[in-house]
Structures are given as C-alpha cells and as structure tokens.
C-alpha cells in the first residue's frame, strides 16, 4: 500500500507498506488449523486470551512449516512422477530408435551389397568391352600389315614389269637394227632378184608407207601428190622437195620406190653423235598404242604369219624404255666397216646429202609432233599420219600381209627372233593377268577394311550411348539423393509434432518402404552420409541457438505476463489467525526491522527545473499490464498484476537483506577495504565518488507509446562560433547552449577538461568542447523523432522534430572539420586520371576501386524540415519497415536483426586467425540529383530511386546556403533501418537535413575518425565517407568495404586511437580508415554464432560484450591480447535473487566507459557501474595488472587472463602520457537500485553539473549512506571533473520499493469497472541521469 504525505517544505514523503496477499492453504493443514482454532477458542472462552497468547505464534509457525513441507512434498511427488514418465518415454524412444537404427544398418548393408554386385557386373561389362576392343585393334593391325605387304609386293612387281619393258625395248631395237642391216646387205642384188623373178606376183605397198628411219630423223613420203596431214603446217610443198631430201633418186617410179625403201639411215650429215638423254618412245617407235600396233604387226608379218602378228599387236601395250647406251647406235649397218663404206658413198654423192636447213626446218617447226627419240632420229607420228590419211584399201593391204620390206628376201635365221618376241608378249600377257588378280585381291582387302571400320564406328556409338546412359543414371541418383534429404527434413519436422502423429507417419513410411523393391530403393554413398550428418550437426547447432534465444524471450514474457505462484507466503496463516484478536478483516501494518526508504524531492528553482517537474522520483501512476496478444477479463488481469507485484516484492525483500554491503545515493556499494597500490598501500579514493542519480522521468509524457532507440551527445570540438559570418545566417548566441551559460557564470574556462574516453596518447590533447546537449531518437508506430534535451536541465525539451517513418537505429555526433583530419584528396586516385574514363579500374594501396575518381563539386544536400521523408522503394523489399503499422513496436530491432542472420559454415580455425590481405573495397559514385522544384515533396517519394541516391539541398531564397547549416560545422549523423542516412547540423537549425543518402541496407553503427565517417551496414559492408575540398561532407563519393557474407551484419564499431574496431560475427576486425585495410582480425569468442555486440575503449584496453552472454572480455588495444574476463551474472543473481523476474539469464545490452567507470546495462533493466582500476587484487593477493610506465619491457608475461600484464608507454615521444589498462573487479562493482523494466537501450556521457543547479536536491538523499553527495570545495575538489551519464530504456523500477503500483489499489477501489490507461507511467520510456565526479587520468 502506497501512502503519500506532504510535509511543510513542499516535499513529498513516499514509503511502502507491506500487506498480505490471499493464498489458499492445503486441506490437511486447513483442517488441522481449524481444529486448533476451535481448541484455542475454547481455551480463550474458559481461561482468557493470556493463556494462548504465547502459544499461538509457536503453533502458527509449526503450521506454516507443516504447510510448506506438505506443499514441497507434493511438488516433489509430482516432479518424481513426471520424471518417471519422462524416463519411460525416453526408454521407449531409445528402444524405438535402436530398432530403427538396426533396420537402417541392415538396409544400408543390403544397399551396399547391391551396389557392389552392380559394380561387379559393370566391371565385367567393361572388361568384355575392353577385350572386344583389343580384338578389333589386333584385326585392324593385321589388316594394316597385310596391306603394307601387298603394297610392297605391288612395288616389286612394278619393278619387274619395268625390267621386262626395258628388255622388250632392247630386243625391239636389236630386231630393227638387224632388219636394217639385212636390207643394206641386199641392196645390191635387188635388181637381179626382180629380173630373175619377173613373174612374181606381189601386192602393191601402201602409198608412202615407209617405216624406215632416215638420216634426218624423218620418215619420207615418196608417192606423187602432196600429203597434207590434219593440223600440220610443216608439210612438204611438192613431190620434188620430198624426193630431193631422200637418200637416193631413181629415174623411174619403180627405182624411186625401191630407192626410197632402201635408203640408209644416218644419224647426221656431220657425223657427230647425238647427246640427247635417254627418253622413252612407244613400242616400235609409235606413240598411239592401239593405232600403231597394226602397222608394226604388218611389218613383222614378213617373218611371221598374220595370226602371230595380230597376237603381238594386241599384247603390246606398254612403252619401250630406250637406254642411254643405245642412243648412239647406228641403224642400218652391222659394223663400223660397213658404215664407213656407206659413208664414203654418201659423201661422194651430193644428191645423198640431206639439206641441213630443210632438216632443221622440218624437225623444229612442229609444236606437237617431231622426234621423240633424238638418238635414233625416228619420227613417231609419221606412220600414224600416213595410216590415218591413207584409204581403207591400204589398211586392208596391210592386214592381208603387204610387202613392207620391198622386193627383198628375208633369211630363215630371222624367224627365231620372232619366236622370242612372241614368248615375251605371252609372258607380258601373263603378268597382266597376275596384275588383274592382285587388283581383285586388293579390292577385296579394301572392302574388308571398310567393313571393319564400319563395325568399329558402330561399337564407338554403342560405347557413347552407354556413357550417356551412365550419366543419366548418375543424375537420377543425385535427384534421388536430393529427394532423400527433403524427406529427411520433412521427417525432422514431423518429429516435432505430437508423438502419435509421428508414430503414424513412421509406420506409414515403413509400410511404403517395404512395398518398394530393394533394387529400386535409394542408395547413397558413405561420402553422402557424412555430408548429411555434417549438415544435420549444423542445423542442430543453429536450432540450439534459436531455442536459447526463444527460451530467453519466453522467460522474459512469462515473467511479465504469467509469473508462477510463489511457494512460501508467511502472511496467509497470520491472516487466518488474526481474526482471533480483531474482528476487522484488514491486517495491521507490519513492523519493519529497518527504516523505511524515504525520498525527498524539493521543487526546483527558477534556474533549474521547470514547475511541471514531478514531485517525486517514484510518483508513478497506476501500473498497467503489458502488451497482450489475447484479451483477458478483468479478473485475470487483476490476478496477473497481483502476481507481478508479488514478484517485485520478493526482489525488494531480497535487496533489503543486510549482506554487509552499503547503500548510498541509490547504489549498493561493497564494504570498504584498502586496496593495494604501487605507491605503498594507500586507500583508493575512487570508491568515494559514487554516481548520484539526479533525474528520472518519462521522456515524452504526452505520447505514452514512444519508444527509445539511441542517443548521442553533441560534440562541438573544433568549432568556433565567433568565426561565423553574421551576414550569411543567424549567429548562434552563446546563451543558447545551457552548458556554456553555466560554466561562464561559474567562471570556469570553456571546455578545458578532456573527456577520458576521447583521449589519445600520441597527440596533444586539445580543448574538449563536448556540449551537454543530447539528441535522443524516439519512435512511435508511424514515425521516428529526435528529442533534443540539455543534460543539465533534462526536464526541459529543447526541441523535437520528425526524421522519417522508419526506425532510426544509430546516431553519432561528428565534430567540425579540423586540421588534423586526413586530407580529403587521399581517398581519390591520382590526379592524372582522365575523368571521362568512367569505367576504368584502379588500384590504390591494394584497394580495388570500381569506377574513377571524378573531382566534381557536388552541391551540398539539403532536406527541408519534413515529417515523412524516406519511403521504402521497391528495390528494398527485404528491409523491415513499420510504415504499415503492423510491426510490434516493443520488439527490439537487434532481436529482429538477429533473426535474419544465418550462421554460415565459415572458415576453419586456422583460417579464422589469419588476417586477410585486404577487403574488397568498392568506390561508389552517385550522380547529383537535379535541383528539386518548388514543391515540398521529398525526392525520396519518386519511387525510382536506387541505392546511393542523393537528396540535394534546397537553395534558400537568397541563393546561398547559410554557413550555420554547413556540414563543415559539427553535425549529427542518423542511420535508419530502411538504409537512409541523414546529416543534420548540431549547432543551429537542427530540423534542416543537410545531406541524406540511401544505402543498400540498414545502418547499424556510425563512428568518426579524422575526417572519415564509417557507416556499418547490415549486409556486412562498411561505407566510408569523407569531406570535400571545401570541408563539407561529400556524400556523392564514398567507398564500400566488404567484410564478409551479406547475411551477417556489423553490429558495433568503436574508435581505438586512430583505428576502428568492428564487431563482425564472433570476430573483431581492426581497420585503418586512412588505407581502408584490415590490419588485424581475431576471435572474441570461440563460437561463430556468438556475435560481438558492444565495444568500449579507454587507455590501452577495449571491453567487448557478446550476444546472449553475461561475460565481459578485456583486450589490449595494441597487442589485441585477451587480458581479463568479468562475468556479471553471479553478481546480479546475488544482488537481486536467483530466478527473480527471469534474472537468471543476464545479457548485456549497453556498455559505456565514463567517469573512470565501466557502465553496464543488462536486458533486465539493471544498471551496474564498475570502477576502473590500475590493479586488480585477486583472492590470493596476486596483482592482475600494473601501472604502465616508461621502462623497457623485460618479459612477455600475461599470456592468459589473470596473469601479470606489463604495459609500457610509447617510446617515440617523451611527452606522451602513459596510458593504463582499464581492469575491473566485480568485488568493487556497484548496482543501481534505479533501473528499467526492459532492456537498457543506451548510455550517454556528457559534461555537466546538475547538483550545483539543484543546490543539493537529489533523488536519493546523501544522508542514506556515508558517501559524499557533492564534490567538496577543497583543493582536492578543484581537481575533480563532473560528468552526466544518461540511460534510456522501457519503463522504470526501483528495486528497493518494488513495482510501484500499490497505489493502484486505492485508486481503483471505488470503481471496479474503471478502465485502466493503455500504458502506465512506470512502463513508459524513461531516462535516468546520474552525476559522477572523477579525477581525470
């Protein structure tokens, strides 16, 4: 029961009364209590109340113990029965799985045997095919050898044939010489022979039929008349010329004929021998074989009969080879003596001398005819032309046996030569027959080879068909394997159904499987089985992770909506027996063994809070039930609220237990102890600087559905307002910054103290101009808004405006342009790159740049103050949006993002530790959009935009941009869930968007390093932006740096010195922003599914938190060595009780280092502050860390967490301040009683001093604990710096008081049907502000 009392000073005293809750006792205890009650009534009636006054508490205690033991016994029996049933089910399932495994093994053995049998059959077929192939190859080889032998035999026969031709030619020449010699010998007696034989009847010779070669190599025609062969233009003009060129002239025709036919043949008139090489002439000096054989047969018929002549003529069809030795042999003489006589006769007779000119003319003027063999001077065509021009009578005379040899008689010894010629012709005919037979055999062999080649082609086709069938079978096997995996997945899904359905499906599958023959069942190899098992293990691992997340989510939801009824309730029996002493049903207020916690809160002064400030920290309206999916009646809702209050009451009772810890300023502090220090054991004074809570209130009271997402303090470093030109815009008044007013009024120098989390050891610390102004991102069902407050006056909202209609996930304050920033041109290629080569690829320090660097002056973007800017375009269908209003606003975006991330197989352990040489970096260029029209419709509503769209600034009426809204000044960068990035000014005209760009995925984190802004996207890429030449941010050119797979996101980033640490999956990538290279990668957690969520840096240490993990890990900033592990779950369980409100599952949702403290926010709304120490004392007195100093390292100690770590400053500079490692000890941890109902969304630290403004009025009175409430005004106090730490989250709770809804009973007592508000004040989004004093390092 909540009671509120007003004191005279205007303050409100609020305290909590305990009262009983109605719980039913067991029947046995109730009956026993009734019996004892009646007995007590009888005793009181007889003897008065004093008799049972001392006895009744003992009896009540016994009954309570009995009731608790009885309930525990019943629970144990129920649990035992459940365990027995589970055991039986497990045994049954084990037996069934065992039988199924045995069946599967048997089937696998059968499959393997069938596969082996099929493999053997295929092997036999392959061997058979190989044997046939070898046989065919052997046959082909034999045929090739036979063909080669036949070709050799054919060549040999050709050689023999040529030899026979040569011999035949020689014989013919010898025969012709013999005939000519015989004629020459019989020249003298020819006249006598004719006179002695006057009555000899002979036939006339054919006209001009002379076959005897003369000296000039021409065959002469004698008969009268001019012979004009066809085509001859060298014929003789008249008979006189023909007769003058002959060897002899006869006075009459008869002598002319005999002289012409008996003329001697001489090689030349000059007597010289011809040197013409050996040439081939046709047989009997005739070229056309078929036409020239007939006259030659007639010529031979002098010694043979007509039949033999015809046989020789028909069988002679080859050319005669004339050897070179026979070219100088004279024709017509048998010896040299006879030739000398003839030569003398020729020389003495001028008529016998042939004219050289005529011979030359006759022999050299025919292009187609002439002497073939110059050695013998024979005209090969003369006989042919004579026969062709002669009539049929002459040819008939020749066939009948004309006397070609004239009147000469032939001797008998010449008939033997003709026989030999006939034998040669017969042998020639036999050789021709043999040749024809060989040709027939050759043709048969060629046909056989063709047949074998065809058979080989057929076999090749069959083999190719077998290969194709094999490929088809392999594809079929793969399809069956895919179907098997699909069926397995369906079976796994079916296992999750009720057990009866699974059994029915299993029996059905077994029945169907039995119907299929063994040969047709699916087969898969051992490799496939191993792959399936590996995939199953991966799916199991992912399923366990998802079950863990679901378990945590269900635990939180159940703790809110369906809390379990507690076992032990002391007030039940007391309420039953209280009726003995009082007739009133209302229980008396219970006495406390400890003083009640009072909260004094005075009204603020004029300079401080406004009058609409709440009167007390816990002045909270009636609580309401959380968001429910199904409507419940009023009775169920009341029971749920009652159970929730009981849970918070148990937490309150546990917190109030005296465990030796101190309570001061709303914190649970450990007992004081003296901490060892390197100086000699002086007491550490940091324990005295306890954070003081100064403010707690809903951020926006008008809209109860507002949710907080993120926040950031304004960083004004590097910005000098007095340098701005007043003509270009309104000059910011220094008084507009409340922090500036307060510090100037107090006489403090402006921003002279450095923020400890922003210090860098290697550069000169400059004046930190961090403002006390804080930008907080809130969202409703439709829009996201920015609420700007001053931490010194958190109750006053400076300004608020709408950003977009999607959730804004991150915000970061970017300082003004500084001389220490990287030059803007370093991210471009060399200046000599042609701007027109838009497709050129360049390499810059190992970075792949896509496109070319065009140094274009893009006008600065500007978005007018709008309430509904970026609408999700069609190309971004995968990005979640809340425009339709169907997304649950209470669902955390980080949980939604976790659900979309799928763990990949990832590299091996060895690959995980290696550093990649360089990420894939893409240089993106976006074309400037055209100047928007006068309409106020945003450019993002066109619907045709793509990733990288730039919204350009709207030009003011004056045509110039105000310098106060220039992005060269401090700016605030906001990243939305739909991929939009907004840039607003942090100094003036906050509502005006200076730049905006659409990226390809959700923006999750933003950091700034020396003129570079790194934007982490949900697809695992980093977008790196830089300033332009004029100092303003240029969003038209940026780099995309790919860190991994697109289904893993970069969840967090932190600036460590001049490096950026990126949390990607379970790894931390250390990136150099200047070179855009990954310098180092290491695993922050051994499991790939455990993602890095928060990073906090100070000095030489970086604290890292892991998703769904309560352990914080400390890593060295330079060596990346794992230094310390801190688990907060035991501490939270000890402070708030194990299992209370689902606190057994602790996860870290917010992390910050401020005021020399490590601030930790959990998913349960608990805020923990751990002082940072230079040394950590373990239980055995061992030191965990030492102060860093300027000495050289001596050894490499500290290889594991808990060892001694020696850290040394930078040796390159003597002026560099030595940094320290921020160790933490849970023995010094401090838990704040002020927390949130849901997860702590963010921590923000800004400089400020609220205590001076409130004149000592704080939320928790300093008198509660011995800790100081405000810094002392002595010399030590002048060195202390003040900082304000803000936390934001859903709802508010004080763990010392409980739910804070006890006043709801009184408010709702009068009207039972009163409708409760949709969201109580305690469940709205709250911000809590602490002030902490610390000594700068």
From Swiss-Prot:
Q: Where is this region: Interaction with NTRK2?
A: 459-515
Q: Where is this region: Kinesin-binding domain (KBD)?
A: 50-80
Give me the stretches of Basic and acidic residues compositional bias.
639-655, 739-765
Q: Name one Pfam family in it.
A: WD40_2
Chain spans, region Disordered: 183-211, 245-285, 633-655, 719-772, 859-966
Record note on what altering residue 266 to A does = Results in loss of phosphorylation of MAPK8IP3. Does not effect binding of components of the JNK pathway
- Coiled coil start-end: 58-177, 437-555
- Low complexity bias located where? 261-270
Q: Does the keyword Coiled coil apply?
A: yes
Q: Return the annotated region ranges for Leucine zipper-like domain (LZ).
A: 424-459
Tell me which residues make up the RH1 domain: 12-100
Top-rank taxon: Eukaryota
What's the PTM story here?
Phosphorylation by ROCK1 is crucial for the recruitment of JNK.
Gene Ontology annotations for the cellular component aspect, listed alphabetically? axolemma; axon; axon cytoplasm; cell body; cytoplasm; cytoplasmic vesicle; dendrite; Golgi membrane
Induction details: Expressed in neurites 5 days following initiation of nerve growth factor induced differentiation. NGF withdrawal results in the down-regulation of MAPK8IP3 protein by caspase-mediated cleavage.
Its Gene Ontology biological processes? anterograde axonal protein transport; axon development; axon guidance; axon regeneration; forebrain development; in utero embryonic development; JNK cascade; lung alveolus development
Q: Quaternary structure?
A: Forms homo- or heterooligomeric complexes. The central region of MAPK8IP3 interacts with the C-terminal of MAPK8IP2 but not MAPK8IP1. Binds specific components of the JNK signaling pathway namely MAPK8/JNK1, MAPK9/JNK2 and MAPK10/JNK3 to the N-terminal region, MAP2K4/MKK4 and MAP2K7/MKK7 to the central region and MAP3K11 to the C-terminal region. Binds the TPR motif-containing C-terminal of kinesin light chain, KLC1. Pre-assembled MAPK8IP1 scaffolding complexes are then transported as a cargo of kinesin, to the required subcellular location.
What role does this protein play?
The JNK-interacting protein (JIP) group of scaffold proteins selectively mediates JNK signaling by aggregating specific components of the MAPK cascade to form a functional JNK signaling module. May function as a regulator of vesicle transport, through interactions with the JNK-signaling components and motor proteins. Promotes neuronal axon elongation in a kinesin- and JNK-dependent manner. Activates cofilin at axon tips via local activation of JNK, thereby regulating filopodial dynamics and enhancing axon elongation.
Record protein name field: C-Jun-amino-terminal kinase-interacting protein 3
The organism named in the record is Mus musculus
Please name the taxonomic classification of the source: Eukaryota, Metazoa, Chordata, Craniata, Vertebrata
| Designated gene of the protein | Mapk8ip3
